[in-house]
């Protein structure tokens, strides 16, 4: 089996075309390919790829349960919790399950051994197939606030080989870090607008802090100005491809279709993107090997 290669598709904000790039890139790639939707708060890759989902696995995190007969109300558990998920009020312990990260610090800190843990469901990991693609997605339970553990569960379910196209959450917050930190390459999708440039800079700062190699895809490349291109040149960031502002792409999107199947010529753009990513990762691997 070929060595696994994870390509994360990310963006500094929502609405730039991140999922459009992810599903179309996955569709044109050859060989063993897995599409992983880690935008667990609102996964939508399935709308376009239309997988037959045949497996679902519930995911939860351990949250504290306090035995009132053993609890002395000392407050050690609340002092130990850096996430403010547990509080001691008038010697009564209150647990806020939606804030809990499941670290177990309160259990360790309790001198009376009054705290145990129970599983708190946060969502489900679903998997199946779409034509030649393996498909995995996480779906956060409605009302649940803790997405990183579910994202990690999606990552743990990935195959050990082949290419993985990882559709990351938008933005630069904790869920994004959880999704992209183990990637071999990150594609940042942006658009040539002031908002697009502002959020691209935040995304670039994030991936640089993580030490991840990356490049940029400019979506709707002919709607704005040259400031995104100027910024990428100044920062020596490779622009992998530019995608035109084509009404046919938007129409295909609105119908839930993969754009490369609906717009002649677009397949070549995404095949070029695949080739550019391969070239970048091959060069990086060669540099690592010579270090």
Question: Predicted segment positions?
Answer:
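Walker A (P-loop) phosphate-binding motif
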Residues: 2-30
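Short, well-ordered beta-strand core segments
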Residues: 33, 164, 186-187
């Amino acid at each position: 089996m070929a060595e696994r290669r994870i390509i994360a598709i990310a963006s500094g904000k929502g609405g730039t075309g991140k999922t459009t790039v992810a599903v179309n890139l996955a569709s044109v790639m050859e060989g063993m390919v897995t599409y992983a939707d880690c935008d667990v708060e609102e996964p939508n890759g399935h709308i376009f790829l239309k997988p037959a989902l045949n497996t679902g696995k519930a995911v939860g995190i351990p949250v504290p349960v306090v035995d009132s007969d053993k609890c002395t109300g000392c407050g050690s558990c609340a002092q130990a919790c850096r996430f403010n998920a547990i509080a001691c009020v008038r010697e009564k312990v209150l647990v806020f399950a939606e804030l809990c990260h499941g670290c177990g610090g309160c259990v360790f800190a309790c001198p009376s051994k009054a705290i145990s843990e129970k599983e708190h469901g946060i969502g489900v990991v679903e998997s199946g197939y779409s034509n030649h693609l393996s498909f995995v997605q996480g779906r956060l339970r409605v009302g649940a606030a803790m997405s990183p553990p579910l994202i990690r569960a999606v990552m743990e379910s990935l195959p050990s080989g082949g290419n993985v196209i990882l559709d990351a959450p938008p933005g630069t917050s904790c869920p994004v870090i959880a999704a992209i930190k183990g990637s071999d390459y990150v594609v940042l999708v942006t658009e040539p607008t002031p908002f697009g440039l502002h959020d691209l800079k935040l995304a670039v700062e994030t991936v640089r802090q993580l030490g991840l190699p990356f490049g940029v895809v400019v979506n709707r490349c002919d709607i704005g100005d040259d400031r995104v291109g100027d910024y990428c040149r100044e920062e020596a960031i490779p622009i992998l491809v530019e995608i035109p502002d084509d009404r046919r792409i938007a129409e295909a999107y609105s119908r839930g279709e993969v754009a490369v199947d609906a717009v002649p010529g677009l397949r070549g753009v995404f095949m070029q993107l695949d080739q550019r990513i391969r070239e970048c990762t091959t060069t990086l691997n060669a540099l690592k090997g010579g270090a």
